[in-house]
Amino acid sequence: MESKNVIAAIALSTAVIVLYSLFFLPEQKSNNQNIADNAKVEQSSDAPSLEQKETLVSISRDEALTQSERIQFENNNIIGSISLKGASIDDLTFKKYKVSLDKEDRVTLLGPRNIKEGYLIESGFVTSDKNVDVPNSKTVWLVEGNNKLTNESPIKLSWTNNQGLKFEKEISLDDEYLFTVKQKIINKTNNKYDFYSYGQIIRNEIPEIIDFLILHEGLIATLDDELIEEDYDDIQENKFTKIAKKGFLGISDKYWITSLIPPKSTEFKTTFDYKNKFRANFITTDPLELNGNSSIEEELKII
């Protein structure tokens, strides 16, 4: 009887050790990795913060679209426009999908930032040098060349600051849902600068949620082959941050997803946060060195 008790005690102790190693030791490793990642994050620049006090005006979507100059885009699947104020993609409608079977209205996904249903995508460069002006959400870009974006004709936007730096965006569109954005800075001075590229998806409010068990609606990413799914209410309470070398990030609905693919072969930090608006953001962690009388360029993709 005593030997049976000893065997049982050994078996129980072994089970406790195995369970501890399975469920607690990896968590400790993960915590250590998060501490290291967070330390690295603190050393890098950060993308522009959301305008927390921006007023959401009570106007219609159509009226909001008239408040800034725009450049149209269209292919066989989507139609919309890019605001020249901020160079944001904030107007997109699906040509082949109806709101309901008994109506002719098409599904609209994106909307201007200054309405309640605001949902948009923007990108650019930032620098830790506070004396250098960079384009922001209020910058008005100029159109060079083509004045309509199609799958056969890309567009180019430009803006020049007072320090002799010219910022360019070349935007192309395939015949499906893929935008490719080539961002470039041309330095016409002898000065040297460091820049970080970023992209972000901004959504003003939580859409109607289906809340189906196997369906994720919220902020989503695949970072270094790890799937990340964060609900809206989770992000309202806690910010998510992770450094990765490859992947995508975005916001998903029942039927639709809006996503960013950061530049290849560069490490980037992904952030999901909420500051009166939801944001899915990436920023490169290593600076691009812009030498005098030279240029730098990076490419990101939007789906």
Question: Predicted regions span which residues?
Answer:
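Juxtamembrane extramembrane loops of integral membrane proteins
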Residues: 13, 23-106
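Soluble non-transmembrane domains of integral membrane proteins
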Residues: 70, 74-303
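Internal alpha-helical transmembrane segments
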Residues: 2-30, 133-139, 173-175, 191-199
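Aromatic/His-enriched, Gly/Pro-containing loop or helix-boundary segments
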Residues: 1-4, 55, 63, 146
